[in-house]
Amino acid sequence: MVVLSKLVSSILFVSLVSAGVIEERQAASINQAFTSHGKKYFGTASDQALLQKSQNEAIVRKDFGQLTPENSMKWDATEPSQGRFNFAGADFLVNYAKQNGKKVRGHTLVWHSQLPSWVSAISDKNTLTSVLKNHITTVMTRYKGQIYAWDVVNEIFNEDGSLRDSVFSRVLGEDFVRIAFETARSVDPSAKLYINDYNLDSASYGKTQGMVRYVKKWLAAGIPIDGIGTQTHLGAGASSSVKGALTALASSGVSEVAITELDIAGASSQDYVNVVKACLDVPKCVGITVWGVSDRDSWRSGSSPLLFDSNYQPKAAYNAIIAAL
């Protein structure tokens, strides 16, 4: 009985220690830890359905300081038919952010994907210019003063660094970039205006070099681009080149860069810590957004790329980031 009593006591002690570890994690906030180093936010992607899922929302409220709407601000959601706007989903996210003290990154105003067919069918230059200006003006006016940064144009480059073929580039040439950014600046001068893309994870890669080359040219022409967003959807073990890539993007002359859609196949602690340290080490890197909370809701769920597992439990990478900060 004495042995059993000691065993029970030992189990109780271990349980209390474990509870202490859990409580320590719950007391930490990845956003607070990150911003204590002078950065602006550590955020995540979400939307109404996820914010109404209690386990997901609790983590968002506690751990993240910024929200990016995963789909509710894209063109097919906000203006599915010409001149008829729907802001229900976007309103929900922005209102939640205001009530809970979160910054918002608007995502996205001009993108070739999730684009209504009525826009894709436009072939007249004046018509597309008018449609583009009206869309940007209407969406940005609704949230004026409430959005920290906007992804004004998204994924406009090919892998070799040339401009992607889209209705915007076909009809307007690269001038659609000027039209979009100048319109955005006129509507909300306080918002940071970004160009955002994926596969900008190595300084030597063609798309990264193309982004830097074009942004330098556009800035020299007076186009008001404040920042470059690098989505940073990484494969396992691909984190070591991120710091160099961020440095290259920052060299374009923009005032800031950000990691905007981070997820990493396998979610290894080393990969996540490498990316966080890369942003910390690059002065112009203002923040990191992970592309979701739980693997359950990830667009790459098969590769378990996020900081929380499918049961909303923190992974080793989460704790490694907290420890590194």
UniProtKB/Swiss-Prot annotation:
Signal peptide: 1-19
EC numbers: 3.2.1.8
Name of the featured protein: Endo-1,4-beta-xylanase C
This protein's record includes keyword Methyltransferase: no
Function: Endo-1,4-beta-xylanase involved in the hydrolysis of xylan, a major structural heterogeneous polysaccharide found in plant biomass representing the second most abundant polysaccharide in the biosphere, after cellulose.
Similarity section: Belongs to the glycosyl hydrolase 10 (cellulase F) family.
Organism: Aspergillus fumigatus (strain ATCC MYA-4609 / CBS 101355 / FGSC A1100 / Af293) (Neosartorya fumigata)
Active site: E155, E261
Biological processes, Gene Ontology terms: xylan catabolic process
